[in-house]
Amino acid sequence: MEKTVEIYTDGSCLGNPGPGGYGIFMIYNEHEKKLSQGYKLTTNNRMEMLGAIVALEVLTRPCVINITTDSQYVKQGIESWITNWKKRGWLTSAKKPVKNVDLWKRLDLACAKHTVTWKWVKGHSGHKYNEIVDDLARDAAGSKDLLDDVGYQP
């Protein structure tokens, strides 16, 4: 039987574009895990996506995932928009290249390994776990240990 994992993610960007980070809080039974990382130059949407991607990629076996985000961009993108983007060769309905295509492809692949249910929560509304991941993301964005977001294109 597959494990059920609760995942909460958030992204933050100081400037947009600017330094950014993601925060992840994972719960499996009584086990909890926090992850975060900051990047030198990125956007809030990339950090929202990367939080979800990293959370899914760290799981070594297929799981049942309930992932909660405050990003409508990520939730709608993966649940609705991505199907047509792939049919159109990663072009929008306006025939323009999909932004953050590197991360959309990675998120699509990461989701395929699991059974994922996406949930949306309003940011900064007092939701316990969303506040935790928001703090993790902001702290990561402001840290000295920043990586290069190699896929970021201004």
Curated annotation (Swiss-Prot):
Mg(2+) 2 binds at D10, D134. One of its GO terms (biological process) is DNA replication, removal of RNA primer. Residues 1-142 form the RNase H type-1 domain. Keywords: Cytoplasm, Endonuclease, Hydrolase, Magnesium, Metal-binding, Nuclease. Pfam families: RNase_H. It is found in: Cytoplasm. Transmembrane segments: none annotated. HAMAP family: RNase_H. Monomer. Belongs to the RNase H family. This is Ribonuclease H. It comes from Pseudoalteromonas translucida (strain TAC 125). The gene is rnhA.
